[in-house]
Amino acid sequence: MVKKKEKEKVIFVTGKRKTAIARAKIVPGVGRIFINKKPIELWGNEPLRLWLREPLILAGDLAKQVDISINVKSGGIVGQTEAARQAIARGLVEFSKNEELRNLYMQYDRNLLVYDPRRNEPHHSASGKGASKRGSRRHKQRSKR
């Protein structure tokens, strides 16, 4: 008579910002957070770490009941931080199935749960009129006189 081990609750979520993609795995635990297999204390600089901890602070005790492992790739450090932040918030809402937490996140910052579709405009070819290679809408300045 061998007791069957209860299946552990595991949640997989993603977060995106600009070109950065964060995949998070959330399991019951003691509040450890790893980004690319390194503790959160080693991530970026202090303002980025504080920004990353916002969903955890808003969640309160729930953040101390889960371990979060995040894998982030592409984009820059700020985009990666925002993607990881979104993945943490989505994962905590899905893990707790708490509508109040979801509403709290939506009131605090909608981008914690909702994808931001804004993108950089691609460069247009230099089609006459002095179009520059510096930007998609930049043109050579013309004098009126």
Which sequence ranges carry the predicted segments?
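Structured, basic alpha/beta domains of bacterial-type, RNA-associated proteins
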Residues: 4-12, 16, 22-27, 31-73, ...
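Beta-rich strand-turn-strand
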Residues: 78-85
